[in-house]
């Protein structure tokens, strides 16, 4: 991302001002939502983004290891190793990590969505989820291409096993479903086991109804 583009993006992020007995404090909207234990996974999954998300997960665990965390996902996917870094941190920390798809969760985005705490994996009504096998652009000498191809196959086997675990689908069904780009609507993703619920409105707690 160029500096000019980054400046434009930063300028578009709203600021929130809060009053306290110490005076006014301002936060960008994402920092304010982090206080509510909400983390956004937005855009390409890559190493820098993964580092920021892992740091936020670890910070929230240190702040309160017993309180749930929620990842809001709107991502076309990205680098497998970056996604696995986020995944492993989600599994490593003590708080339960719920996942919610808004917009899309494709490729590694769908993997992170499925890896959320069972019963806490949600998609909004008009979101879409896409699963497929990992790909790689092998180049160089024949021996190097062969090494890269073996690594892609090994990574594919590992991801298929994890998808099978999170969806409770047979590994054969996962391999078949992920052979090519496979786009699912929210209800289809629920039936497949990638998510647990489809929401069009935030659930209202019983005490709020009274």
UniProtKB/Swiss-Prot annotation:
Gene from which this protein is expressed: clpP
Entry keyword Transport: no
Keywords recorded for this protein, A-Z: Cytoplasm, Hydrolase, Protease, Serine protease
Assembly notes: Fourteen ClpP subunits assemble into 2 heptameric rings which stack back to back to give a disk-like structure with a central cavity, resembling the structure of eukaryotic proteasomes.
Gene3D superfamilies with a match to the protein in the record: 2-enoyl-CoA Hydratase, Chain A, domain 1
Gene Ontology molecular function, alphabetical: ATP-dependent peptidase activity; ATPase binding; serine-type endopeptidase activity
Primary location: cytoplasm
GO CC, any one term: cytoplasm
Subcellular location field: Cytoplasm
CDD domains hit by this protein: S14_ClpP_2
UniProt protein name: ATP-dependent Clp protease proteolytic subunit
Catalytic reaction list: Hydrolysis of proteins to small peptides in the presence of ATP and magnesium. alpha-casein is the usual test substrate. In the absence of ATP, only oligopeptides shorter than five residues are hydrolyzed (such as succinyl-Leu-Tyr-|-NHMec, and Leu-Tyr-Leu-|-Tyr-Trp, in which cleavage of the -Tyr-|-Leu- and -Tyr-|-Trp bonds also occurs)
HAMAP family reported in the protein's UniProt record: ClpP
GO biological process per UniProt: protein quality control for misfolded or incompletely synthesized proteins
Protein function: Cleaves peptides in various proteins in a process that requires ATP hydrolysis. Has a chymotrypsin-like activity. Plays a major role in the degradation of misfolded proteins.
Keyword Protease in annotation: yes
PROSITE patterns: CLP_PROTEASE_SER
Species annotation: Zymomonas mobilis subsp. mobilis (strain ATCC 31821 / ZM4 / CP4)
E.C. no: 3.4.21.92
EC class of the enzyme, as a word: hydrolase
Active site, renumbered: 107, 132
Family: Belongs to the peptidase S14 family.
